[in-house]
């Protein structure tokens, strides 16, 4: 066996990374965002036993983050290890991790913050007479230490977060408002779960005044904290969570055996919004989950809660606060750097408890209706007593509970079962009365898809033999065009047609299809094809070479075309058509006569001039010209290669998705990849199909475009961009009870709210949650809007501040208007109107779907692939 050749470079030895580099690398993985930085500092204050925590931000946290508390403070002997990596007082070894009850235990937060920013800490322990101010370098070492007068507690100041990582710092500053909104969401969770702790957060932009972000009063329970953060109005829509053991059906769903379930493993408390429509929220911005009072993001729990809620209110999401208490030995919190992903031992049991409890809560007495009649049976018939046949089907009784609480004729049914009954009844009645579809005939100028596909398929294609006499073809009466019956193998480009599909009578066997390529030059040497005679004939009857809007009536309007018996035999055209044929035919006849030995006679000898060459002496200037046959051959070879390359590119199958609902996503991706906006203006309009679709051609690809869907999407986007909704003034200003952060978002995006028809009065001197009052609401005919649309708009602007956006109900209104004002299916369009619709597709952002989700455009065939086959 041969030895490997020695490497010219010396082998790189494995070495330990220096401590400073390790520190900077790992620190960037601990503190990931503004929210993480604030979270770590607030958790330190809570671990120190603080009852009063103040968070102060400058420029949304980009300039300064300062957290002050009245906790126990830091003893002087712990100053050195306060900001060193993996120095902590919470645990001593790994076994202590199982029983840890504090938020922090790794000793990484302050050390990482030192590596990413400039950290200053002032602290005063309860045993010290005076406080101390400490300044740290990026390695966590103390650079300055001085006495500092302050009360018991600790203040940590973070300046220029991420400035040691230039790329992240620039990205952080660019998205500071998004980071700020996420930070507030995290801080709200600690405000809710921290009982007896007053948390206050303010933000100062530039040299302006401080604006409150969130504030709590240190309430003794969850309910008071929720009211302090989100206002008393939010409390009115909440019901307490009532824990129930999982029933047999749910246990079977999760594969649990009721006999083997541990008892009292989980204790769940909290609140959730009622499932009545209008009580929930349009987004998931107010969902808080805690495990042992630690904020977390349990993905499966979140999914389950929303799914159960959607069974009763499918258009909204619940407000929910859930605290799940479980033995610390059954939990692993050391999973991710931010400790928000938590692993549980008996997770299926937790999900079963939650599902059973939520279903029972939403189906409880709060959401029951009293009805006088029996429920619908499964097929939608009413089961009523014999004597009640003439009574109303469902009779709501508002006084049933007070007037006759023990009535036997009344049944109690839940909202969910009532909705199910109604949906069954309505579904059945819907299918029993289908709508009648009105069919219309197209104008005589429109091309049928059969004509288009057959003319471009090949010049040797032959129509079916079944036909009627040419006498009917000569008729000047317009023939109604029928629709295509079937298109087979749309990917390969072949289609199956019949006489009924084509919409007109075809010639007998042997007749050839009129070629589309009438504007291509005809080769003189090969002109025996019947198609070329018909092309020349079409020219003589006055048809434009560029026009593709010829109907089959053309063949029978002014010049009569005799029946063709055999395509290989010479066609007997009328005399007027034969005379009008160019010199191609005459040349061919003379050649045949010459072969037969018949020479043409000279009719006029006086006009006959002999051809004699006469020598003429001309002075010529000779210019030498460089010529290389080799260079010419090389150039020809390159041109041939380039043409072959272009042909291969054209024959490449760029569109593979079928026209099927299951392949909509694939088809959209292909169109988005292959079609750019400027290509729509270059598309050639072939015609209209079925009074509802436009057939367009780009290079060698045929596309079918829904005329209604594409016009609807264009109108929708124009309404979205340019419509300013008119507002209706309120009689008296309405208090919105917004949170401090939502007030800030609204004030910063007032212009966007005004374009949506909302107007407010701002009182900067009013207390938090009372600064903004609504004075105008948008109204538009039958559409009305309210505070829930403001909440949705605030949520959207929290993620994309300053970007023009619309609430979902405004989008629905625009979609409805765009649909009504668009070109309808069944409307005949001329070429200019179709071209306008196709060109508009290149002027909008998302041309592939209408606002209601229908596709606007699909690829139907590639002509190159059809020709090659």
Swiss-Prot record:
ATP binds at residues 44, 69, 108-110. Pfam families: DNA_mis_repair, HATPase_c_3, MutL_C. GO terms for cellular component: cytosol; MutLalpha complex; nucleoplasm. InterPro entries: DNA_mismatch_repair_CS, DNA_mismatch_S5_2-like, HATPase_C_sf, MutL/Mlh/PMS, MutL/Mlh/Pms-like, MutL_C, MutL_C_dimsub, MutL_C_regsub. Its main location: nucleus. Its EC number is 3.1.-.-. GO terms for molecular function: ATP binding; ATP hydrolysis activity; ATP-dependent DNA damage sensor activity; endonuclease activity; MutSalpha complex binding; single base insertion or deletion binding; single-stranded DNA binding. It catalyses: ATP + H2O = ADP + phosphate + H(+). Component of the post-replicative DNA mismatch repair system (MMR). Involved in B cell growth by positively regulating B cell proliferation and controlling replication efficiency. Controls cell cycle to prevent re-replication and defects in DNA damage-induced G2 checkpoint. Doesn't seem to counteract or control the immunoglobulin gene conversion (Ig GC) and to contribute to guanine/uracil mismatch repair. Possesses an ATPase activity, but in the absence of gross structural changes, ATP hydrolysis may not be necessary for proficient mismatch repair. NCBIfam families: mutl. This is Mismatch repair endonuclease PMS2. It comes from Gallus gallus. The gene is PMS2.
């Amino acid at each position: 066996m041969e030895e490997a050749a020695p490497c010219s470079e010396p082998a790189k030895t494995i070495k330990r990374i220096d401590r400073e580099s390790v520190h900077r690398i790992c620190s960037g993985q601990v503190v990931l965002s503004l929210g993480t930085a604030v979270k770590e500092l607030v958790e330190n204050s809570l671990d120190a036993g603080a009852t009063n925590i103040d968070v102060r931000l400058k420029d949304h946290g980009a300039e300064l983050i300062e957290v002050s508390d009245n906790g126990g403070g830091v003893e002087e002997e712990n100053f050195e290890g306060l900001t060193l990596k993996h120095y902590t007082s919470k645990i001593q070894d790994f076994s202590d991790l199982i029983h840890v009850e504090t938020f922090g235990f790794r000793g990484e937060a302050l050390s990482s913050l030192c590596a990413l920013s400039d950290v200053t800490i002032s602290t005063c322990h309860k045993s010290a007479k005076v406080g101390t101010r400490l300044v740290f370098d990026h390695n966590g070492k103390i650079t300055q230490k001085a006495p500092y007068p302050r009360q018991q507690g600790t203040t940590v100041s973070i300046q220029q977060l991420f400035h040691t990582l230039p790329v992240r710092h620039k990205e952080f500053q660019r998205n500071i408002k998004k980071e700020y909104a996420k930070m507030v969401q995290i801080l709200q969770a600690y405000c809710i779960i921290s009982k007896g702790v007053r948390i206050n957060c303010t933000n100062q932009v530039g040299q302006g005044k401080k604006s409150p972000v969130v504030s709590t009063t240190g309430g003794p329970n969850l309910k008071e904290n929720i009211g302090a953060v989100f206002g008393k109005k939010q409390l009115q829509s909440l019901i307490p969570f009532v824990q129930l053991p999982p029933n047999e059906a749910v246990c079977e769903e999760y594969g649990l055996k009721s006999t083997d379930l541990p008892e009292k493993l989980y204790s769940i408390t909290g609140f959730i919004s009622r499932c009545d429509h209008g009580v929930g929220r349009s987004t998931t911005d107010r969902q808080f989950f805690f495990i042992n009072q630690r904020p977390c993001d349990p993905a499966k729990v979140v999914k389950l809660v929303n799914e159960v809620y959607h069974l009763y209110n499918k258009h909204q999401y619940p407000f929910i606060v859930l605290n799940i208490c479980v033995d610390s030995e059954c939990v692993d919190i050391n999973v991710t750097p931010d400790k928000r992903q938590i692993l549980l031992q008996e997770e299926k049991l937790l999900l079963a408890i939650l599902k059973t409890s939520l279903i029972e809560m939403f189906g409880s007495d709060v959401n029951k209706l009293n009805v006088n009649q029996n429920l619908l049976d499964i097929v939608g018939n009413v089961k009523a007593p014999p004597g009640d046949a003439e009574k109303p089907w469902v009779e709501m009784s508002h006084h049933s509970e007070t007037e006759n609480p023990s009535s036997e004729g009344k049944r109690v049914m839940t909202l969910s079962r009532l909705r199910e009954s109604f949906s069954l009844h309505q579904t059945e009645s819907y299918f029993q009365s289908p709508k009648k579809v009105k069919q219309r005939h197209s104008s005589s100028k429109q091309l049928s898809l059969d004509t288009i596909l057959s003319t471009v398929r090949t010049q040797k294609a032959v129509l079916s033999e079944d036909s009627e006499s040419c006498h009917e073809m000569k008729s000047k009466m317009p023939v109604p065009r029928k629709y295509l019956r079937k298109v087979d193998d749309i990917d390969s480009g072949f289609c199956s047609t019949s006489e009924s599909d084509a919409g007109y009578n075809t010639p007998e066997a042997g007749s050839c299809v009129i070629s589309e390529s009438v504007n291509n030059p005809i080769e003189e040497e090969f002109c025996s094809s019947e198609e070329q005679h018909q092309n020349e004939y079409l020219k003589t009857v006055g048809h434009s070479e560029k026009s593709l809007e010829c109907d089959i009536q053309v063949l029978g309007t002014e010049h009569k075309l005799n029946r063709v018996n055999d395509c290989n035999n010479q066609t007997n055209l009328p005399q007027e058509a034969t005379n009008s044929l160019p010199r191609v035919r005459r040349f061919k006849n003379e050649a045949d006569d010459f072969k037969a030995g018949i020479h043409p006679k000279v009719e006029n000898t006086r006009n006959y001039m002999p051809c004699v060459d006469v020598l003429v002496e001309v002075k010529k200037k000779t210019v030498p010209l460089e010529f290389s046959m080799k260079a010419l051959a090389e150039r020809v070879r390159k041109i041939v290669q380039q043409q072959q390359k272009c042909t291969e590119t054209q024959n490449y199958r760029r569109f593979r998705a079928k026209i099927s609902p299951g392949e909509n996503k694939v088809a959209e991706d292909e169109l988005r990849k292959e079609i750019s906006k400027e290509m729509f203006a270059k598309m050639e309009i072939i015609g209209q199909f079925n009074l509802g679709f436009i057939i367009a051609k780009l290079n060698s690809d045929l596309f079918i475009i829904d005329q209604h869907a594409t016009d609807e999407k264009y109108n929708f986007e124009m309404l979205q961009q340019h419509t300013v909704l008119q507002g209706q003034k309120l009689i008296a200003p309405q208090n919105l009870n917004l949170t401090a952060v939502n007030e800030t978002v609204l004030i910063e995006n007032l212009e966007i709210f005004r374009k949506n028809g909302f107007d407010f009065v701002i009182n900067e001197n009013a207390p938090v949650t009372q600064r903004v009052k609504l004075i105008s609401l948008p109204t538009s005919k039958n559409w009305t809007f309210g505070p829930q649309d403001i909440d949705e708009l605030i949520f959207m602007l929290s993620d994309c501040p300053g970007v023009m956006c619309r609430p979902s109900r405004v989008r629905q209104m625009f979609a409805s208007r765009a649909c009504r004002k668009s070109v309808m299916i069944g409307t005949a369009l001329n070429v200019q109107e179709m071209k306008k619709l196709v060109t508009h597709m290149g002027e909008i952002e998302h041309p592939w779907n209408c606002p209601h989700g229908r596709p606007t455009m699909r690829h139907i065939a590639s002509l190159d692939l059809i020709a090659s086959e």
